Amino acid sequence: TLATLTAWHMLVERARVKAGEDVLVLAAGSGVGSSAVQIAKLSGARVIATAGSEEKVKLALDLGADHAINYLERDFLQEVRRITGKRGVDVVVEHVGTDTWEKSVGCLARGGRLVICGTTSGAEGKTNLWQLFAKQLNLIGSYGGTRRELQTVLKLVADGRLRPVVDRSMPLEQAAEAQWLLQERRHFGKLILNP
C-alpha cells in the first residue's frame, strides 16, 4: 500500500486531479503506476496509460485506463496528442525520470500539471523553458504521503474501491530472480518477497 499511498498523494493532494480531466500515467505496470491508474479513474478523470508490452497494455485497460500505449512500439507523445486532439493532458504522473521527462512535459496541455515522485531511469531531465512559461505549466514534486491519506487509502482498499496490484509473491531465497524480474520489467504491479 505504500505505492498506493504515494500515487494518492501525487494525484489527490499535489496535482489535485478533478473529474473530467485527462491524466497520463507513465509505467502503468509499476506499483505507483497501477495505483495511479485506479486513483485517477476513481477521481473521474480520463486515463491514458503507458506500458512496455501488449500484455501490460491489456492489464492497464483492465485496471480502468481508457487508453493504453505500448511505449516500445509507439511514441507516447504523438499518441497522447492524437488521443487528446492535440490539446495534451491536464496531469502527467511521472516517476520514470530521464528517459521520459522531455516527452512528459511535452504531453501537457496549457496550464497542465506534471507531478513527479521518482527517477527510476535517472535524475537529469531536459526541459524546454519556453514551453514551460508559454504554456504556463506546473512542475510538482511529491514524496510519500500523510497518515490521514494512508487511512483514506486503507479504507478504499478495504472497501474494494482500490486494489494494490501484486504480480507475485516469492520466497526470500528467490530474491535474485525477483531482482531480475524487476530489471527486465517482467512484472505488473509489486513483487513481494516472503521471509
Regions picked out by a protein language model, each given a short descriptive name:
Residues 1-74:
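Mid-domain Rossmann-like dinucleotide-binding core that forms the NAD(H)/NADP(H) cofactor-binding site
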Residues 19-21, 89, 111:
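Phosphate-coordination loops involved in phosphoryl transfer and adenosine-cofactor binding
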Residues 86, 161-165, 177-195:
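C-terminal capping/lid region of NAD(P)-dependent oxidoreductase domains
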Residues 43, 51-54, 60, 95-165, ...:
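Glycine-rich phosphate-binding loop and adjacent beta-alpha segment
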Residues 24, 92-93:
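N-terminal Rossmann-like NAD(P) cofactor-binding module of classical short-chain dehydrogenase/reductase
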Residues 76-86:
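Short amphipathic alpha-helix with an adjacent loop that forms part of the alpha/beta core around
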Residues 7, 175-178:
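Non-catalytic, hydrophobic alpha-helical segments
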